[in-house]
């Protein structure tokens, strides 16, 4: 991994204390998205990691609603593969499958179109940030329902103190930046 590129990415993540509620330190990726060099570096770094581990053995990138959509298509293009969308409930037309995940107060659902993938296709799930792992686990469940193979989950940022990586069990996980 290129240290100068990683530093370019890291410098574009800013922190907002007590947002959206007191006690939360919000990691904002907006400056990264505004800077084409930093954004390109983030895509190159994620793609380089995936190429080194999986070579040409990835069929699709699955982007998670909503900020995973910012990285999914660009990462897919860099790897020369397609991108599928995993959306919040009620946002996809046609027949869908759904999986629930817990929120701090209640639950939410993700959906994928039933014909998004074929059994056995190898998929990498991407999101901007991994916190508790609830969303990523629900996405893995959806892909398992389609009998696709989740080869890895990746994110730009990981909040290590929330232990989301542990919830993924045996599924490999990679993040460019880690914060407590």
Curated annotation (Swiss-Prot):
Phosphothreonine sites (modified residues): 135
Keywords from the UniProt entry: Acetylation, Cytoplasm, Glycosyltransferase, Phosphoprotein, Purine salvage, Transferase
N-acetylserine PTM sites in chain numbering: 2
GO CC annotation, single: cytoplasm
Residues modified as N6-acetyllysine: 114
Entry keyword Transferase: yes
Official protein name in the record: Adenine phosphoribosyltransferase
Native source species: Mastomys natalensis (African soft-furred rat)
């Amino acid at each position: 991994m290129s240290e100068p590129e990683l530093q370019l990415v890291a410098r574009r993540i800013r922190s907002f204390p007590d947002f959206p509620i007191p006690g939360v330190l919000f990691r904002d990726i907006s400056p990264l998205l505004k800077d084409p060099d930093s954004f390109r570096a983030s895509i190159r770094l994620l793609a380089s990691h995936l190429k080194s581990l999986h070579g040409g053995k990835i069929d699709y990138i699955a982007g998670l609603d909503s900020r995973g959509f910012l990285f999914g298509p660009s990462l897919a293009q860099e790897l020369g593969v397609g991108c599928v969308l995993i959306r919040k409930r009620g946002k996809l037309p046609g027949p869908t499958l759904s999986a629930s995940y817990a929120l701090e107060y209640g639950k939410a659902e993700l959906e994928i179109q039933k014909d998004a993938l074929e059994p056995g296709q190898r998929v990498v799930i991407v999101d901007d940030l991994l916190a508790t792992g609830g969303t990523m686990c629900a996405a893995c469940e959806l892909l398992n329902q389609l009998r696709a193979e989740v080869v890895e989950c990746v994110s730009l940022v990981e909040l290590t103190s929330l232990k989301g990586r542990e919830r993924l069990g045996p599924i490999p996980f990679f993040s460019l930046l880690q914060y407590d």
